[in-house]
């Protein structure tokens, strides 16, 4: 599902520490498009109904309950550790099914990109 580098310069807003906060655009291009939004995975109609294509990911993730794990919210703005998406990407204990992306887990840098975006508020840019 998720791969590649951290956000390139100019792809995020300045955070309170003077660093760059990832944007949905950077997460979309570096994670979702690169590792998730394929015809066999999360392109329309999407595995488990989850579509992570351009223009669909934010509304499919933010404050949305998991279809596979009722009660688990996919993305909780400001709370990456509590977000089921991050738990699935990390392969945390208690997830339903497999770590994502199946068979090709993301590297730590790409997971951190998603974590940073969520912790920064998971804005739709």
Give short role names for the model-derived ranges.
Residues 1-3, 36:
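Sec-dependent signal peptide hydrophobic core
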Residues 5-7:
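C-terminal motif of bacterial Sec signal peptides marking the signal peptidase cleavage site
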Residues 10-21, 25-112:
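Solvent-exposed helix-loop boundary motif
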Residues 108, 112, 120-125:
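Flexible coil segments in periplasmic/lumen-exposed cytochrome c-class electron-transfer proteins
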